Amino acid sequence: MRECISIHVGQAGAQMGNACWELYCLEHGIQPDGQMPSDKTIGGGDDSFNTFFCETGAGKHVPRAVFVDLEPTVIDEIRTGVYRQLFHPEQLITGKEDAANNYARGHYTIGKEIVDIVLDRIRKLADNCAGLQGFLIFHSFGGGTGSGFTSLLMERLSVDYGKKSKLEFAIYPAPQVATAVVEPYNSILTTHTTLEHSDCAFMVDNEAIYDICRRNLDIERPTYTNLNRLIGQIVSSITASLRFDGALNVDLTEFQTNLVPYPRIHFPLVTYAPVISAEKAYHEQLSVSEITNACFEPANQMVKCDPRHGKYMACCLLYRGDVVPKDVNAAIATIKTKRSIQFVDWCPTGFKVGINYQPPTAVPGGDLAKVSRAVCMLSNTTAIAEAWARLDHKFDLMYAKRAFVHWYVGEGMEEGEFTEAREDLAALEKDYEEVGVDSADAEGEEEGEEY
C-alpha cells in the first residue's frame, strides 16, 4: 500500500485541510463519523482510499493527517465542528500562544516546544503504514506558524524520513490582499529554509483564486470558505490518482520525476478547469479540448504570472471523469500547434497525461457545478519566477529600512539570516532565468567570452 500522510500547519493549513477532508469523505462515501456505509464495500474491491484513510477494527475510517497550530482557536473549530468524530483527538495538536505572524517565533522560540510532540504523532501514523510514500504539507508562506514552524518541521522530517517525498501546498501571499505586513519576510525566510527539504511545492496565490471566484463563479465577495473549496478541488485532482484506480495512474514520486528537471526548480504552476457555477454549466458543453485549452489561459492559473513570457519545461495533465485517451491526444496535438505555448528546446516532448475515471465530486451547497469531466494541469514554467521577483522586491523595500526586523532579532534570529535567505532567492531567480535560455544561445555566449 502506498500511504500518504497529510500535515496541515497553521490557520491556512488547517482551513485547507477542512476543505480537503470534507471533499475526500464525499468522494469516498465516508460519513462525518468515519463510517462507510456497507453497500460501498461489498464487492467494490476498490480500497485505494486506504492511502489517505486507515481503517480501525470498528470499521471507522480515520484520516492519515495531523493538524498543528501554535494557537488553539482554528483547530478548536475542528474539535467542535461537523467532522469532529472523523479525526483522532491526538491528531489535532495546538499550542497555547500564537506565532504572531513572526517566522522566528514559529521556527525558534515557540515552534521548538511543540515540534517533538508533532513528530511523535507523525511517527505513530508512519508506523501504521505498510509502505509510506511521503508527506503532503499544507501551509501558508505569510503566517508565523505557516512559515516558521513548517520549515522547522520539514528540516526534522528530512532527518527522520530522509528518502520520503515531501510535497508542499503553499499559500503564496497575494499581491493585493495581504493579511500581514511582514509576509514578504516570512515567505522568503521559509522558502530559503525549505528549498532543500521540499521535493515539489504547489503554490496557490490567494488573489488568483479570488479572481477565479469572482469571474467564473460570480461570487462578489469570496470568503475563505469559497477559496478553500476551490483549493480542495485542486488538491483532490492532484491526489485522485493516489486514491482511485485509474487508466494511467500517477503516484507521488512520478510527479517529481516528470515535473522537476533540477532539484531547485520545483515550483509547478497549477491550473484547473472547468471552474464554473451551476447556472453556467447548464448551458455549456465542456469537451475535453475545451477544458484542455482553458488550462493554458492565464486566467485559470493559481498563481498570477504570465506563461506567455516564459517557457514550459514540463507539463502534466491530470484528467478525471469521462475522458478517453483519443480525445486527450487530439487536444494536445491542437495545443502543440499554437505558437503562444513555448517549450524549452531541451525538453521537446513535455506532456505527461494521467486519466482517472472518477468524475469530480461537487460539495453540496458549494459553488462549483457538478461536471462530468475536469482537468488539472501542473506545469513547470519559467514564468513562475515572476512571483519570486515580486516577493523579493517587497522584501527589499522593507529590508532596506530594516523595518520590523527587531521583532525577529528579539526572538533569537540574526540579521545575517535575512541576507542569506535573500541571496538564496536571488540565486533561485537566476536559476529560472538560466533554465529558460536556449542551449544554442548559451553556447554562443560562452564562445563570445573567449575572444
Swiss-Prot record:
The record marks 451 as: Involved in polymerization. GO terms for biological process: microtubule-based process. The active site is at 254. It holds the Pfam family Tubulin. GO terms for cellular component: cytoplasm; microtubule. Gene3D superfamilies: Helix hairpin bin, Tubulin/FtsZ, C-terminal domain, Tubulin/FtsZ, GTPase domain. Mg(2+) binds at residue 71. Signal peptide: none annotated. InterPro entries: Alpha_tubulin (IPR002452), Tub_FtsZ_C (IPR008280), Tubulin (IPR000217), Tubulin/FtsZ-like_C (IPR037103), Tubulin/FtsZ_2-layer-sand-dom (IPR018316), Tubulin/FtsZ_GTPase_sf (IPR036525), Tubulin_C (IPR023123), Tubulin_CS (IPR017975). Its cofactor is Mg(2+). Undergoes a tyrosination/detyrosination cycle, the cyclic removal and re-addition of a C-terminal tyrosine residue by the enzymes tubulin tyrosine carboxypeptidase (TTCP) and tubulin tyrosine ligase (TTL), respectively. Acetylation of alpha chains at Lys-40 stabilizes microtubules and affects affinity and processivity of microtubule motors. This modification has a role in multiple cellular functions, ranging from cell motility, cell cycle progression or cell differentiation to intracellular trafficking and signaling. Keywords: Acetylation, Cytoplasm, Cytoskeleton, GTP-binding, Hydrolase, Magnesium, Metal-binding, Microtubule, Nucleotide-binding. One of its GO terms (molecular function) is structural constituent of cytoskeleton. It catalyses: GTP + H2O = GDP + phosphate + H(+). GTP binds at residues 11, 71, 140, 144-145, 179, 206, 228. It comes from the Eukaryota. It is found in: Cytoplasm, Cytoskeleton. SUPFAM superfamilies: Tubulin C-terminal domain-like, Tubulin nucleotide-binding domain-like. Its EC number is 3.6.5.-. The modification N6-acetyllysine is found at residue 40. Dimer of alpha and beta chains. A typical microtubule is a hollow water-filled tube with an outer diameter of 25 nm and an inner diameter of 15 nM. Alpha-beta heterodimers associate head-to-tail to form protofilaments running lengthwise along the microtubule wall with the beta-tubulin subunit facing the microtubule plus end conferring a structural polarity. Microtubules usually have 13 protofilaments but different protofilament numbers can be found in some organisms and specialized cells. Tubulin is the major constituent of microtubules, a cylinder consisting of laterally associated linear protofilaments composed of alpha- and beta-tubulin heterodimers. Microtubules grow by the addition of GTP-tubulin dimers to the microtubule end, where a stabilizing cap forms. Below the cap, tubulin dimers are in GDP-bound state, owing to GTPase activity of alpha-tubulin. Belongs to the tubulin family. This is Tubulin alpha-3 chain. It comes from Homarus americanus. The lineage of its organism: Eukaryota, Metazoa, Ecdysozoa, Arthropoda, Crustacea.
